[in-house]
Amino acid sequence: RPDRPSLIDASSGRSLSVEESARLTRGLAWYFHSLGIGAEDRIVVCVPNSIWHFIIHAAASWIHAVTVPLSPLLPDKQRQEIYELVSPALIISADGHPVDGVSALPLSLIEERALQAVNQSPATWEPLTCYEQTAALVFTSGTSGKIRAAQLSHANLWWASQCFRDG
């Protein structure tokens, strides 16, 4: 059911259908691929919560890249430390803040890039199969107060989504 609602942005009220979400995901995956981003490359997502977190993650998963979600409220020094730890291939942020030697993309251009790229992707281009590969690095300080990355596989995220969905 391609017209069924897929994602709803709570802050803006924007709703995407299954078809729209799939089209944006495919286009963004091809855009990342065209930048030379591939398996195990890191894509930092440092933007306020929105539907784009999901679309960016799904697009990165398509090519086996790893998303690294970061709060835009983190102090600059802490963000810089994380950038040094993960060596991102791309940083997506609200303002497109550049980091030495790393491509930056402002969130405001994501949809435009995805829609341009979707028409360039081959019709036969399909997501790569993945399961145990790293899907995301989630930074936490835990009880120690020292920032650490929790490495989550696609299987971890699938299990978590099923638990959330099924209660």
Residue ranges of predicted features:
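Structured binding elements
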Residues: 64
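Conserved AMP-binding/adenylate-forming core of the ANL superfamily
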Residues: 6-50, 54, 58, 75-80, ...
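Conserved pre-ATP/AMP-binding loop-to-beta segment of ANL
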Residues: 2, 120-139, 146, 151, ...
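Conserved ATP-dependent adenylate/AMP-binding module captured primarily in the ANL superfamily
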Residues: 57, 68, 72-100, 115-119, ...
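Conserved S/T- and glycine-rich ATP-binding loop of Class I adenylate-forming
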Residues: 43, 60, 134, 140-143
